[in-house]
């Protein structure tokens, strides 16, 4: 497992609109992945703020990659629940999306995601997730 494997998973496993977000794998370790979501006009709202929809899509995507890094390969899964808290606007900078597997059982996996500004390091969104392992 390496960053290239995880980057390739973005192209192989996700819908074209997710690929259009141009997510980049920055780092990983087993059960943890950090992605960079580049700032773009297509994902921004008034005031160049990153939209909540883009943050949630990036969070969900990062968590699937964290599960891949946990298992060592892709294991089919589906999102059961995602709870998000938007803490502050994220404007005029890339976002770092860090996903961490908290626990994996036989049927369910649990994780948490923190999205922060790449320049200021301030947390803009926190999410918790539950996935069904298929």
Describe these PLM feature segments:
Residues 1-134:
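Terminal targeting signals and extreme-terminal segments of soluble enzymes
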